[in-house]
Amino acid sequence: MHYKQYLVVIPGIVLAFVLYTLSQGFNNILGIELLGYEKSPISTAMIAILFGMFFGNVFKMRENFIKGLEFTQKYILKLGIICLGIQLKPFEFLEFGAIAIPLIIICIVSVLIVIKLLVKKLKIPTRMAYLISIGSTVCGTTAIMATAPVIGAKKNEVSYAIANITVFGILSMLIYPYFANFYFDANPTFIGLFLGTSIHETSQVAAAGLIYDQQFNSPETMNVATITKLIRNTFLVIMIPLFAFLYNRGQSKGKNYSILAIFPYFVLGFVGMIILRNAGDQVFLSTYKEIWINTVQYIKASSKIFLTMAMAAIGLSTNLRDLKNMGYKPFVVGFIGMATVGVVSILTIELYINFLS
């Protein structure tokens, strides 16, 4: 009986993997071959969810795929988030931490306050507000995917939030490098801090840094932007349990409530991967360097595959009519969230510049 229960999820998992493969291939053609980037600035996860939504709404999904798609969204997603921790090396961030961490905290708090006020004004669903908030402040689609299961977000809410964050992330990726060069008078450190705190996705930050480097010959800017963004990504460890607590406390309405019941324990696996990476760098780089580097790269690649498969599964399970019914208001919140994090980042960096002078 148990053996058959495992077999029933295989078709859906395979379908999600096939869609990941198609999405990755399409992204390589679009971002590398056509646009000419060394690495595509477009999120493969976003392409996967769009492909999934297309196929899922054009063709009727067969019953034998459903359980596997649900398994992918629930468990393979969490496995991908756990593996994501292997790419974070906080001990290397100490040099920029004194500047970047306060800046990141101020940006996060400011956006959360603004979005909370907008939610009351525009009356959008609480889950949607949480998804847009964490996507705008921490690390884009990855943060949305990680937060969705702990607040019980619906598939259409996840799809909408990811589309929201991706659109505004790409806009800021294309505009901010040129704006920052003008505003910060070509200072590589301040421009890097601004790009790293104001653009949603890690891939978009890297692309913005690359655009700036190619346009203004400043590799230092790209390095500062990337490090700042990775520091920002580590806040996922704090924000997911916090959002789980706040959301579920709000839903309990006076009933008995336990943080242990809703704590996202996969976050512990994420933290464990961060510890493993830093411990491994200390122990194995001097003795088994090539093996350790290959292992880290393998886990990184696996994380991207698992997360993109989960997005493909979400897309396949999303009904476009549900997205249409959600209206334009969440996009207004997403735009204002993008503008807020940009303005707050500029003002905070200005204060820092004035302090130094």
Indicate where each model-derived feature is located.
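Entry/N-cap segments of selected transmembrane alpha helices
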Residues: 11, 15, 71-80, 84-116, ...
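Alpha-helical transmembrane segments of multipass membrane proteins
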Residues: 19, 23, 111, 115, ...
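Juxtamembrane helix-boundary/capping and inter-helix hinge elements in multi-pass membrane proteins
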Residues: 1, 32, 59-61, 88-90, ...
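Alpha-helical membrane segments and immediately flanking helix-loop junctions
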Residues: 124-172, 190-214, 302
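Structural signature of multi-pass alpha-helical membrane transport proteins
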Residues: 2-71, 84-91, 238-303, 310-322, ...
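Structural signature of hydrophobic alpha-helical transmembrane segments
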Residues: 37-51, 74, 96-109, 133-136, ...
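Transmembrane alpha-helices that form the ion-translocation and gating core
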Residues: 102-132, 172-188, 279-283, 305-313, ...
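Juxtamembrane and boundary regions of transmembrane helices in multi-pass small-molecule transporters
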Residues: 1-4, 16, 117-124, 175-198, ...
